[in-house]
Amino acid sequence: MEEKYGGDVLAGPGGGGGLGPVDVPSARLTKYIVLLCFTKFLKAVGLFESYDLLKAVHIVQFIFILKLGTAFFMVLFQKPFSSGKTITKHQWIKIFKHAVAGCIISLLWFFGLTLCGPLRTLLLFEHSDIVVISLLSVLFTSSGGGPAKTRGAAFFIIAVICLLLFDNDDLMAKMAEHPEGHHDSALTHMLYTAIAFLGVADHKGGVLLLVLALCCKVGFHTASRKLSVDVGGAKRLQALSHLVSVLLLCPWVIVLSVTTESKVESWFSLIMPFATVIFFVMILDFYVDSICSVKMEVSKCARYGSFPIFISALLFGNFWTHPITDQLRAMNKAAHQESTEHVLSGGVVVSAIFFILSANILSSPSKRGQKGTLIGYSPEGTPLYNFMGDAFQHSSQSIPRFIKESLKQILEESDSRQIFYFLCLNLLFTFVELFYGVLTNSLGLISDGFHMLFDCSALVMGLFAALMSRWKATRIFSYGYGRIEILSGFINGLFLIVIAFFVFMESVARLIDPPELDTHMLTPVSVGGLIVNLIGICAFSHAHSHAHGASQGSCHSSDHSHSHHMHGHSDHGHGHSHGSAGGGMNANMRGVFLHVLADTLGSIGVIVSTVLIEQFGWFIADPLCSLFIAILIFLSVVPLIKDACQVLLLRLPPEYEKELHIALEKIQKIEGLISYRDPHFWRHSASIVAGTIHIQVTSDVLEQRIVQQVTGILKDAGVNNLTIQVEKEAYFQHMSGLSTGFHDVLAMTKQMESMKYCKDGTYIM
């Protein structure tokens, strides 16, 4: 029986079956993983050599030689004409289309290589199909695979943005005009013109071009699967496709050879470099990927293949010596390039890290709903499981749908709606300022635009805090997300303190040596900023005044209470009161208001200092106004920081101290109540004041009556989320059985005798 049913009984062709993939022991996979990593290392070597070759060889000639060498090898070993079924005319047409598409993708790939260099090309283009498909699934479908896949997609997008915005690739930036060698054919001239039309630098256009080529490659591979099955396998299809590509490119190469001057003095000297590129990039990588895809899962193959090629790219980007370039330079016919071209930068390193993280996450199989905890059984005997992470899984959705739902929630509530409208107005003014600054080459406008962009980040944080505060409570966050507004206000306050500190230090430095200022564009910019900020002041002023006045108002809530009788040695009751208060400190709105107020003061200070400088030449007015503004910002934000810290540290709300003192005195006088202990009261959010208390009652009293009276007294004092524990004599007897004396327990609970009161009603334990 063991021999009959042992082995891969569940495995189908290729190691998989209808019942799911069978895990291969890791020891058997080690050799394939090592082979895959070594192959990716060699492919990185081939791409770096390809970049050097493309400096001397026309891109069409380069692709033709690669296709020719690959076709020769694959036709020789695969024998596509003598093995397998006969190719029909309809299939030959499809193979022709396949070859055309392959040539176009190769053209985009290698032209992107000439623009970005091999390091950035490897980071952008060498992603597995499963990674790109997972990325597109997250972005454009509602079943993207959960929060992990969404996080991986975000990492991928951040990596591309790092290459676009934070990569100081100086080679192309230094070239005001392209060398004539780049325009030696209509094809390259057309591609450069298309990139110039986008209005971006060449290496940034190369990044966009490689992203486009990557998407085309994935679509090309997906569309080729059915054709590979029809013609007898992927290897046979590749052999025929490369052969057709050679025939397609041959006339073009002949025309180029006749009409253009070759930069290569001796083609014989390039045989070994081309052979290396053909074998490492085209042949070895294809065959090893095919073998590893069969022996391992596709996701594992993608995950184990991405890390070594990205690390190899970083290493070669720093240590590659361009041997072929030196050889061509010795011939005195290749264009001289600096050895520092396409070097490593901080943006590239950060981008590589994010690419590695995204490839690892996006290539991992989705594990939604695979692990759960047994929590009990149904009345019918069915086991019930609680699946970990379900609090987060249900909210996973596509990004467009998430944005749509978020906008809907933002516009439903007054606070978030006001922040959103002011954020849009602020962003509009910011981009107008940046656009006009670039148009007029005004550094002052550009710097002020980026300053306002920084202020917008505070508005975005306040907006998301207002949105998250309305999220429903989950199993993990059982109290909900109401306190996120307090945290947002605290962080905004810290930002303002940092801003005030740096403005203060810069103002002191300028007081000693006042610089001369160009006030040409300061007045219109400051007036425009003042108008925008005054609109924000009017919109958010209610939050500031409400935070100081409305918290004294009474609380209105609907409550419910219940008692729970414990069995055995104790008899407990628990009462709960839940409701929503009528007002409180909204630290989030106060933080947003103070940010707008700081910008308003800044605009006023700039206007005043500009007038004094233009009319009287008082350059010292600028640092004096800035110093005054920094002090005002600091003084206005200190109360916000203080209040937010008190809430985060669970301090008794100061506005309720006297009411709670009176309420505890009333509780002590309730008939049948002996004493109370452990009274704890704190503000949870702007609308919730929570509390817990233990009360000791006589054995003959009705617990629910006591709970109702205590709940009513504390609700009138402002506590709208209350938990009461009722303790009877049986509880103390139970504690006595646990080696604690009855009189000791009773003395422990009578805290009223040891409680000290201040004259203002504040009590101290």
UniProtKB/Swiss-Prot annotation:
Location (main, coarse): Golgi
Record organism: Homo sapiens
SUPFAM superfamilies (alphabetical): Cation efflux protein transmembrane domain-like
GO biological process: cobalt ion transport; GPI anchor biosynthetic process; insulin processing; intracellular zinc ion homeostasis; response to zinc ion; zinc ion import across plasma membrane; zinc ion import into Golgi lumen; zinc ion import into organelle
Designated name of the protein: Proton-coupled zinc antiporter SLC30A5
Topological region Lumenal: 54-56, 120, 174-193, 260-267, 325-342, 440-448, 505-520, 614-617
Similarity comment: Belongs to the cation diffusion facilitator (CDF) transporter (TC 2.A.4) family. SLC30A subfamily.
Region His-rich loop, annotated ranges: 542-578
Entry's localization field: Golgi apparatus, Golgi stack membrane; Cytoplasmic vesicle, COPII-coated vesicle membrane; Cytoplasmic vesicle, Secretory vesicle membrane; Golgi apparatus, trans-Golgi network membrane
Catalytic activity field: Zn(2+)(in) + 2 H(+)(out) = Zn(2+)(out) + 2 H(+)(in)
Induction behaviour: Expression is regulated by zinc. Up-regulated by endoplasmic reticulum stress.
Record-level GO cellular component terms: apical plasma membrane; cytoplasmic vesicle; endoplasmic reticulum membrane; ER to Golgi transport vesicle membrane; Golgi apparatus; Golgi cis cisterna membrane; Golgi membrane; membrane
Lineage: superkingdom: Eukaryota
